[in-house]
Amino acid sequence: MQTHNNVDPQEIAKFEKMAATWWDPKGEFKPLHNLNPLRLNYIDQTAGGIFGKQVLDVGCGGGILSESMARIGANVTGLDMGDEPLDVARLHALETGVEINYIKNTAEAHRDEHRGQYDVVTCMEMLEHVPNPSSVIQACADMVKPGGYVFFSTINRNLRAYVETILGAEYLLKMLPIGTHDHNKFIRPSELIDLADNAELFCKDAVGITYNPITDIFRYTKSLEVNYMIATVKND
């Protein structure tokens, strides 16, 4: 297996350590469980439905998004470099009777034999955890079919994002383990759109996600100041 070298061992170890609680809706990944319906709806609606489509989930982790896409009829392949998260993902899929092809590999290496193969590629909450985000973006672009969709989500790099996602979510609210995020690795929307454009991915839409700690609810917002998603289309 060729992996290429766009991997941060410390990031892999961080999520390996938490893998056992991946599917606990009240555990360390509670925010992902609560956020996932918004992600799934955005992907499905923007792409015109993913039923019957070939979908690649880059940085799938324990499979929360992968499983939800498979349940609505997508043919899903999940990529990750963490052994423990992949083991958890495979076991949970087996227990729930969902068919997903989980593979240990990087996007760059998987691209070598899968150019233009997927109708939809998702890369959610992953770019801020790799040394070279532009390399992942280019690989995603290379693997999607012309006219296909590539979805990215990450965190904006500004003071508000630092306060909400690190000081708030990690230190005050204890929603995430301390050290989950590094503010220096956050990506501004303008930067992400430029990187996508360089990979011949046209940004069709962008939406923000906001969290209310009182109601414990995530919702869409027009503001891209903190968490956000973009939908891009591969040029024909």
Curated annotation (Swiss-Prot):
Keywords carried by this UniProt record: Methyltransferase, S-adenosyl-L-methionine, Transferase, Ubiquinone biosynthesis
UniProt keyword Manganese, yes or no: no
Transmembrane parts of this sequence: none
Domain of life: Bacteria
EC number assigned by the record: 2.1.1.222, 2.1.1.64
Sample GO molecular function, one term: polyprenyldihydroxybenzoate methyltransferase activity
Described function: O-methyltransferase that catalyzes the 2 O-methylation steps in the ubiquinone biosynthetic pathway.
The family this protein is said to belong to: Belongs to the methyltransferase superfamily. UbiG/COQ3 family.
NCBIfam families the UniProt entry points to: UbiG (TIGR01983)
Name this polypeptide is given: Ubiquinone biosynthesis O-methyltransferase
Species assigned in the record: Shewanella pealeana (strain ATCC 700345 / ANG-SQ1)
